């Protein structure tokens, strides 16, 4: 029988993991920021932990060295995620773990994507994924600025071709303090401005903001202030990358096929220019499709040296872009024949849907939105479980962009990132003029259905929502309108375009959206695709946008200039009354019997708080008033001299006990039943009989003396509805 060979004792080798963090700190807006790499996520292409106060965000980037075969676009993805453990919480729900991205996570992912995307070189097709994970969260500051800095720093040290870094800053404003950096949540609640600015050391690339009617000069000042203050972050990231960054990858853009470019210009440039003179979008697209097909048929081939179909289409697009941009720079009419400052024709209708609480159809050229406003009770408010704590939002805004709006068949389903982002921008535009929940105790939902789109559907949603809300009777502080601006810049020449088309957005260098009232700006969003946008250009764009906004408001005001005085008959009726806190138990009753009885009797719903505030919800005003009357009856104090309609509860030899309020009886003495002498109470009264009585007295023990004979003919009982 064989034996296993004798095993030799293994030598235990001690492995030591060396974690050597490299750290840099800088100050911005009175806060200390720390950049750290080399300790966490070392297998990522680049990883930086950014800390400030109690906030810590891990930024990682992974990039592919080579593009996927046939890749025709830049596959950049940005994922911002908030872990509930960062705030010392356990996720709610059955599964007790984070699930699909929240709206806040989606919006912040877009916020980070927008300024970094234009800084990758043209033609770069390698996959890049940026992941920002909030690992510790302060209850005072939003972690989005730390996340933007983390993304910038991770890209800066990764070696991936990236023309950054960027910095980011949040700017607040009050009349007393002026502009200030890094506002807390508490400071934002009283600030007239909430603006996030991002950019490089030379240029602003992205602005996202909401304001409470600031002027164009104040908004521009905030942009410049934020850009100036973020320079400390940009300098720190540059120094951090110089000390800790990997060598920049060797990457060269694909050599331009000038022969093909010139061939398309020569053969089809004139036809493309003629096609862009067609005013109708669908007809223009059809003609451009025909020209493109002809170019592919003539120039593409499978033989050696011939360009592929995809290559011909790519260079055809470049010729399209150059044709349109040259026309704009030379001052020629735009694609639809307008000059640079003219707004497309506007058509406004309200009350277009009979069953909804408020509705509007807003059409501007080939962009159209049907917007509805629905009123609900405070039970319908959105409950947001954020890292900084739970809060309630009574104003909901949802934006839908179905594929038919651009003449296409496509995916239908839950909203994508773009729809969520556009909805939030439109909501920012009208939020400043919305009433508070105390002023108007309703939950409000606005829904924008984009039915046609050719540029700036989000700003059409702003206009449409303002109209629909006023149609519903929501007491807006002022009407709001929005406009999208564009820019074409070639060298030192530039043209600012008012009310851009979809093609102008795609082919231009800037997307600049402004919403506001006649008095000032309520929202500003800016995305810039190139370097070199000067203060002068931004100032001109804001001035031009102001003129366009006032024009649109004038057109809207011709149809409806102020909220309707009455709510829709279909809207729920909400009434708020105040009772003494000691009376709450009377309204609730034993085991809730009284309040349930009121609800069953009237069809209303009732909410009470500890301060004695009673909110009554009903489908119509009559049901609400009936419930109000019942609550007032229950909580009313008996008034001497008042007349009540009561019910005889019990008859005794010396009189009758009459119930005049819920749970409150009084005695009508036999001598107070009639002017004439009565021998037997039962000769005049019977149990269950309804009678009018007047209160003569309430003694210090709460005993109530009533009289029937003191009620004069024609007198009516006290009206508790008043």
UniProtKB/Swiss-Prot annotation:
Any one cellular-component term (Gene Ontology): cytosol
Enzyme class: transferase
SMART domains cross-referenced by the UniProt entry: KH, S1
InterPro entries: ExoRNase_PH_dom1, ExoRNase_PH_dom2, ExoRNase_PH_dom2_sf, KH_dom, KH_dom_type_1, KH_dom_type_1_sf, NA-bd_OB-fold, PNPase
Chain positions recorded as Mg(2+) binding sites: 505, 511
Gene Ontology molecular-function annotations: 3'-5'-RNA exonuclease activity; magnesium ion binding; polyribonucleotide nucleotidyltransferase activity; RNA binding
Keywords of this entry: Cytoplasm, Magnesium, Metal-binding, Nucleotidyltransferase, RNA-binding, Transferase
Pfam family, one: PNPase
Needed co-factor(s): Mg(2+)
Localization annotation: Cytoplasm
Recorded family membership: Belongs to the polyribonucleotide nucleotidyltransferase family.
NCBIfam families in the cross-refs: polynuc_phos, PRK11824.1
Protein's name in the database: Polyribonucleotide nucleotidyltransferase
Protein's organism: Marinobacter nauticus (strain ATCC 700491 / DSM 11845 / VT8)
Gene that this sequence comes from: pnp
